[in-house]
Amino acid sequence: PLEHVEASKSVERSDFIFWNYDQQFKALTESQRKVVECESLTSPLRVDGAAGTGKTVSLLMRAYRLLKMHHDQGSPFRIIFFAHSESTSLRNKDCFSLYPNSEYYLSPSSEQTILFTTLFAFCREFAHIDRSAVIEDNAADSKTYQLMLIDDVVKSALESNRVKTYRPLISDEVYALFDSEKTDRATLINMLQHEFSVQIKGRTDCSIESYIELETIPNGIPCKTKPEKELIFSLFNDYQNMLQSQNTFDVDDVTIEAISHLNAPFWRRKRQNDGYDYIFADEMHLFNLNEQSVFHFLSKDTSSKEIPLCFALDY
């Protein structure tokens, strides 16, 4: 079960993140303190609220408290703290570095240690994918570039009358997505990006046959018939061809490749030693389902169905 905590009050001082740990702790709201002091280390802990409500600093303080507690007990403890972008990850690490004994905890060789990284960088390194092989080295930039490529794909399909060719074979609902008067182009591009990433790459073997068999999802493109699936898959193929022409992979390729390495005998044997005792994920709402799947393979305890995870997300 999720332990739901709501960080409901804003931290008034803009320099709050630069205070020392004791000063911060004294200034916490009740809901923020619940996050920091939550005793459970086995069940997921969800922290939600509007931007500026102190979710991230609550996560950082919780991480520090866990490390200090296990240091005082003399028991090893490994934490990994994920962010979506490099800039956010660096900021989180900088804030943590202001806490006492932080240099020790930030050292990978310490008995109690924390690693600040992006999920994209972690997956790329775990799968041994060279930086030059990805369209962008930052997940946020990579996803922006994905949208640009998909926009080019749609533009080409409209100009070549491919969509009009399918008009007699597809529903009004699907056709309306390609009508700029009925659907904003940005909305269509984002829906296609989700379809390519989560549905086709995440849930099929990237073949038209398996995609046709796949059930649609409520928040996806409502393509239910074979012609509708064929139209969307033709756009997906164009997108893949663009990546191939540039000899690059997108963020979902990297994530899924990492999962294939994580869900394999070599890592399953190493997890008990090299896995993590606790996982943090800042801005969880920015990770898609493929990315969120990674968290299931990181904890040391392979027998537990629950993940020792604390995550923050905006309303």
Short names for language-model regions:
Residues 1-315:
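The feature marks helicase ATPase cores and/or their adjacent C-terminal helical subdomains
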